[in-house]
């Protein structure tokens, strides 16, 4: 009888061990790879950077013409796809411009339609302050929004202004272009009703946007 109880206890312990092994626990201090979404195949982020003492703060933007510059706030062209292409190496692509962030021989950033492993892949390093540095293995320079004059001034110093980036989630979900245009045209084509509870016609304009559940 006693041996039977021992066998039952063994089976129970084995079952508990398998259950725990099959479901890894999530710890609150799991590490930066969890908080920064490094486990995701593609991260949608805005890359925020700022100069000394918080001056010249902006978001990296890849425009449709391939120009890479600063956006004062989050915009459609500052929304980026960050995708791992190798160990600790990523490719960065503009969601709306459909251009890859790439670096020229002089360290100038540009957006290219064709991905190049040499010019458009960057080593991703997370710093203790939470900011990321993206460095080109080929050119041995960090991604930076600094000007040509600044790059020359800081040459061989191991640091460039506007080269530390904070990955940020989009603050406002994007609306479909056709819906946003429709609402804006309706909103600004009608005169304001100053004595109305809805002077801008927001409620009226949104009545056309109905949940699929209402159609049941």
Curated annotation (Swiss-Prot):
Organism name: Homo sapiens
InterPro entries named in the record: FGF15/19/21 (IPR035444), Fibroblast_GF_fam (IPR002209), IL1/FGF (IPR008996)
Name listed for the protein in its UniProt record: Fibroblast growth factor 19
Induction: Induced by the bile acids receptor NR1H4 that binds and activates a NR1H4-responsive element within intron 2.
Other information: Contrarily to other members of the family that can bind several FGF receptors FGF19 is specific for FGFR4.
TM stretches of this protein: none
SMART domains according to UniProt: FGF
Superkingdom field: Eukaryota
Function recorded in the entry: Involved in the suppression of bile acid biosynthesis through down-regulation of CYP7A1 expression, following positive regulation of the JNK and ERK1/2 cascades. Stimulates glucose uptake in adipocytes. Activity requires the presence of KLB and FGFR4.
Gene Ontology annotations of biological process type: bile acid and bile salt transport; fibroblast growth factor receptor signaling pathway; heart development; negative regulation of bile acid biosynthetic process; negative regulation of gene expression; nervous system development; neural crest cell migration; neurogenesis
Subunit (UniProt): Interacts with FGFR1, FGFR2, FGFR3 and FGFR4. Affinity between fibroblast growth factors (FGFs) and their receptors is increased by KL, KLB and heparan sulfate glycosaminoglycans that function as coreceptors. Interacts with KL; this interaction is direct. Interacts with KLB; this interaction is direct. Interacts with FGFR4 in the presence of heparin, KL or KLB. Interacts with MALRD1.
């Amino acid at each position: 009888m006693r041996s039977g109880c021992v066998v039952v206890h063994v089976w129970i312990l084995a079952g508990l061990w398998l259950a725990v092994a099959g479901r890894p626990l999530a710890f609150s201090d799991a590490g930066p790879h969890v908080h920064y979404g490094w486990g995701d195949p593609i991260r949608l982020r805005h890359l925020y950077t700022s100069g000394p003492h918080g001056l010249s703060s902006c978001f990296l933007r890849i425009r449709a013409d391939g120009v890479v510059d600063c956006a004062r706030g989050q915009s459609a062209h500052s929304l980026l796809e960050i995708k791992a292409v190798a160990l600790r190496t990523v490719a960065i692509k503009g969601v709306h411009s459909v251009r890859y962030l790439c670096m020229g021989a002089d360290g100038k950033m540009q957006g290219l339609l064709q991905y190049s492993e040499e010019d458009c892949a960057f080593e991703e390093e997370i710093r203790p302050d939470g900011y990321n540095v993206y460095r080109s293995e080929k050119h041995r320079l960090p991604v930076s929004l600094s000007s040509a004059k600044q790059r020359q001034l800081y040459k061989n110093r191991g640091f460039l202004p506007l080269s530390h980036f904070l990955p940020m989630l989009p603050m406002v979900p994007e609306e479909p272009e056709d819906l946003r245009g429709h609402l804006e045209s309706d909103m600004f084509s009608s005169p304001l009703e100053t004595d109305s509870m809805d002077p801008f016609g927001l409620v009226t304009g949104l009545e056309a946007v109905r949940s699929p559940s209402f159609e049941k």
